[in-house]
Amino acid sequence: MKAIEWRDNRLIILDQTLLPLEEKYLELNDYHAVAEAIKTLRVRGAPSIGVAAAYGIALGALGIETQYCSEFLPLYQQVSAEIASTRPTAKNLFMAAERMDHVVASGTDVSQVKISLVEEAVKIHHEEEEASRKISAFGAELIQPGWTVLTHCNAGPLATAGYGTALGVIIAAHQQGKNISAFATETRPLLQGARLTALELKEAGIPFKLITDSMAGHFMQKGVINAVVVGADRIAKNGDTANKIGTYSLAVLALAHGIPFYVAAPSSTFDKSIESGRDIVIEERKPEEITQIRGQRIAPENIAVANPAFDVTPANLITAFITENGIIRREAKN
């Protein structure tokens, strides 16, 4: 399954909201459709969101029918702003938009700018693919033979437009013959673990067990989990990390049980412009994601609901970051 493909100036995405029941690809021909796909999680995962955003901006630019820079620029800015407004937490989205904006700012010929925008989007895609491969290789070195690794949400090929980050580490360790196994949390409320990670683990041939989010502490207490590896949506300058809601709880549990807690993420997820996790904007999603499952109501009507999509794990709970440039370990004093 390919999460994202650029073909003949069209963006082809796998609709991840339908998995694992249906494998359906969507052909997106304009940037509005790309923005909607990002908002509705048809494409998801920080690296994949960044790649889709770049292609969406390129599509929007290709659709601007003028050869005059003075007319092109304000229309382009509308495109970029709409794509950037889709989801507030993932750093990769804003990184992609900034790079595309830089291409426009440095150009003088509209036709060439459009070509350069497509080239930049393809470059971003290739960079994320290569980064995920390197992350997986570095991370696999941390996994010992026979270990059982727990992962949360989905940070595999579907989420990264490439090989995977957290799940890529597990897949790489398996391919090295380390005889490992995995636990995958179902990841409420949208069940990315049950729907997507379980599917990718099954396809990779890795022995695993699917558990509810609240079971993780039980299995840590039983001593059957040797490491936790998760992805990230944004990492602050001090190492505080925003990831899928529930990640912080897992980090606290891992510390309490002496289990290493690793964050696997490309450099595009690191945001040096913010000092700490206090500055990370946490996306609040619609209450129906909690009160309904696939359109079926599971909670009483007219109740208050809180639905933050992410939480922030303080840097002092993270054993190390796994990046395409190597392993970044937490210093003893910081």
Curated annotation (Swiss-Prot):
The keyword Repressor does not apply. Signal peptide: none annotated. The keyword Isomerase applies. It catalyses: 5-(methylsulfanyl)-alpha-D-ribose 1-phosphate = 5-(methylsulfanyl)-D-ribulose 1-phosphate. Substrate binds at residues 44-46, 87, 192, 243-244. GO terms for molecular function: S-methyl-5-thioribose-1-phosphate isomerase activity. Gene3D superfamilies: translation initiation factor eif-2b, domain 1, Translation initiation factor eif-2b, domain 2. Keywords: Amino-acid biosynthesis, Isomerase, Methionine biosynthesis. Catalyzes the interconversion of methylthioribose-1-phosphate (MTR-1-P) into methylthioribulose-1-phosphate (MTRu-1-P). Belongs to the eIF-2B alpha/beta/delta subunits family. MtnA subfamily. Pathway: Amino-acid biosynthesis; L-methionine biosynthesis via salvage pathway; L-methionine from S-methyl-5-thio-alpha-D-ribose 1-phosphate: step 1/6. The active site is at 233 (proton donor). This is Methylthioribose-1-phosphate isomerase. The record marks 153 as: Transition state stabilizer. Its EC number is 5.3.1.23. It holds the Pfam family IF-2B. One of its GO terms (biological process) is L-methionine salvage from methylthioadenosine. It comes from the Bacteria.
